[in-house]
């Protein structure tokens, strides 16, 4: 059917034909590929906002840790799921968020990028780059919070993770998959111990994560510079939430680092994670919980603050061989006040971990660094995480030093001591000097074994305390140049070499060292150092003379 419309040109009108069939076919053609779709969204509204917290109504199907989107694109994290509303923390700028605004449920659980693309980078708890080197390149993401490996999925900790610190590797050894707490007052060297442990993993096939929680920005920059200088950033990722960050970021930072570490563990690799420090995470969680109006408990912490740390630290494990045999080792840090390890958060974390390294303020101030207090420090894994060589030389070292500390405290009262006690004190001072170590200078396991063998077998007994560090330095130089085969044997086998060879080498060096020390003293016009027996003989007539 065709309709024709006509008009005169003079009147400005025109003729055209309308073909209904053509119009229908064109419309059909355009509608053929059309599929109706509905964009369905869950939308709620803000009923209260302030202090980084938003209370939202109208999102009944929201999950815990689900991401919410505010107007303007700012993200929030659902933490409280109440009957009538949701308590969410705002992950970003709050200036434009107001009551009455719409909030959209994204359906996504908070995740972070993982994988080797993170190595050498400094990121925030959401995995966003902070180092100005462009976006993080990662093809995989992982949820911040996942279930820790079960009992069947684990195997006992039996493989050593060398920290490079003599006093730790000898007396409180750390194994792959272990959780070893580093605890002490502020300014006692906790961060230095952990950074040294990271530096010592170079060439060991261990990837590292350093999580800085509530630290000063300058402190984090210093740690990153130290790691770069030592070439450790090649296998390390730094996750930082500085003191200037809002509380939600400090709360999330450790879980973000754990997710990155678990990725490597699940792929059969080995990882080491440092949480520096969990005291500040607990304080941030307390702040969030009080703002979310959760009931406060002891010291105003919420009732689940133990679970806050236990679910984090339980994610560190040594997986069974059927799952690839990967491991995630944790070094959590806790700051104490006035040395009080019996406070709430310290006792919580001590009960969760597999031992603790306690750094004492008095030792630190007296020049014993690292300031490890052997009396209270312990590794619940113990000798299982040591090589046979280290176990052989460090067998009684911890007991000897603990007894020395007690005897030293007793001697400070000015009591008369017998010859055995004096000898024990003298050896204790020399062993303490031997265990001192410079900042950021971790020592290979084979060199530690040689050094400790010399100390525990009495080779230091005839030296002055002031000569011990020089003796150790020159002894190790001698072994590197003349006895590298012995060092290589210790490194490859993990066992002590032929004791006669080792003892003969140390004995020969000790004699040369004593001769050179005496010659130097004679040339300087000083009396040569006497051994203990000669000194005791000289003391006796002097005492008789003074009595007369």
Would you name each region that the model predicts?
Residues 4-9, 13, 96, 263, ...:
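Conserved catalytic/coupling modules of large nucleotide/cofactor-utilizing molecular machines
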Residues 101-103, 110, 114-117, 130-179, ...:
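P-loop NTPase nucleotide-binding/switch module
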Residues 171, 248-285:
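Phosphate-binding/switch loop-helix module in NTP-utilizing enzymes
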Residues 205-208, 234-237, 268-272, 325-330:
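Loop/turn-to-beta-strand initiation segments
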Residues 3-30, 36-39, 45-161, 497:
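Acidic-enriched and Gly/Ser
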Residues 203-206, 217-263, 290-302, 322:
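Nucleotide-state-sensitive switch-loop elements of NTP-binding domains
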Residues 176-226, 277:
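Walker A/P-loop NTP-binding active-site region of P-loop NTPases
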């Amino acid at each position: 059917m065709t309709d024709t419309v006509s008009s005169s040109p003079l009147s400005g009108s025109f003729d055209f034909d309308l073909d209904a069939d053509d119009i229908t076919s064109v419309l059909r053609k355009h509608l053929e590929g059309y599929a109706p779709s509905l964009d369905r969204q869950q939308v709620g509204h803000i009923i209260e906002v302030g202090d980084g917290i938003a209370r939202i109504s109208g999102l009944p199907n929201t999950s815990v840790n689900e991401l919410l989107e505010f107007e303007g694109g700012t993200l929030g994290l659902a933490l409280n799921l109440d009957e009538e509303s949701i308590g969410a923390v705002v992950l970003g700028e709050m200036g434009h968020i107001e009551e009455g605004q719409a909030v959209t449920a994204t359906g996504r659980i908070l995740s972070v990028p993982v994988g080797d693309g993170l190595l050498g980078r400094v990121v925030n708890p959401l995995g966003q780059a902070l180092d100005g080197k462009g976006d993080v390149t990662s093809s995989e993401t992982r949820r911040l919070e996942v279930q820790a490996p079960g009992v069947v999925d684990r195997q006992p900790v039996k493989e050593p993770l060398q920290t490079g610190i003599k006093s730790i590797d000898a007396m409180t050894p750390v194994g792959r998959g272990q959780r070893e707490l580093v605890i002490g007052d502020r300014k006692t060297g906790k961060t230095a111990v952990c950074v040294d442990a990271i530096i010592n993993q170079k060439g060991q096939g261990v990837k590292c994560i350093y999580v800085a929680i509530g630290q000063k920005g300058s402190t984090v920059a210093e740690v990153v510079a130290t790691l770069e200088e030592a070439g450790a950033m090649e296998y390390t990722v730094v996750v930082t939430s500085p003191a200037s960050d809002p509380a939600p970021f400090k709360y999330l930072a450790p879980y973000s680092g754990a997710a990155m570490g678990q990725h490597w563990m699940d792929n059969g690799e080995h990882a080491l994670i440092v949480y520096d420090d969990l005291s500040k995470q607990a304080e941030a969680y307390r702040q969030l919980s009080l703002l979310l109006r959760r009931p406060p408990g002891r010291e105003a912490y919420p009732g689940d603050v133990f679970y806050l740390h236990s679910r984090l630290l339980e994610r560190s494990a040594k997986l069974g061989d059927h799952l690839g045999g990967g491991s995630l080792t944790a070094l959590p840090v806790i700051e104490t006040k006035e040395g009080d390890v019996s406070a709430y958060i310290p006792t919580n974390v001590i009960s969760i971990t597999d031992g603790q390294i306690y750094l004492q303020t008095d030792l630190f101030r007296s020049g014993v660094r690292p300031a490890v207090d052997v009396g209270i420090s312990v590794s619940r894994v113990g000798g299982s995480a040591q090589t046979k060589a280290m176990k052989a030389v460090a067998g009684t070292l911890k007991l000897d030093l603990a007894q020395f500390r007690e005897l030293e405290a007793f001697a400070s009262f000015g009591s008369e001591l017998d010859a055995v006690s004096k000898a024990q004190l003298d050896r204790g001072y020399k062993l303490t000097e031997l265990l001192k170590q410079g900042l950021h200078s971790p020592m290979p396991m084979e060199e530690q074994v040689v050094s400790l063998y010399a100390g525990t077998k009495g080779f230091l007994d005839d030296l002055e305390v002031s000569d011990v560090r020089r003796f150790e330095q020159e002894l190790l130089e001698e072994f590197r140049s003349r006895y590298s085969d012995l060092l290589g044997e210790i490194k490859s086998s993990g066992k002590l070499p032929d004791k006669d060879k080792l003892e003969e080498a140390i004995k020969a060096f000790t004699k040369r060292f004593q001769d050179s020390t005496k010659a130097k003293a004679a040339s300087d016009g000083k009396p040569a150092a006497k051994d203990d027996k000669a000194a005791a003989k000289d003391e006796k007539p002097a005492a008789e003379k003074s009595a007369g």
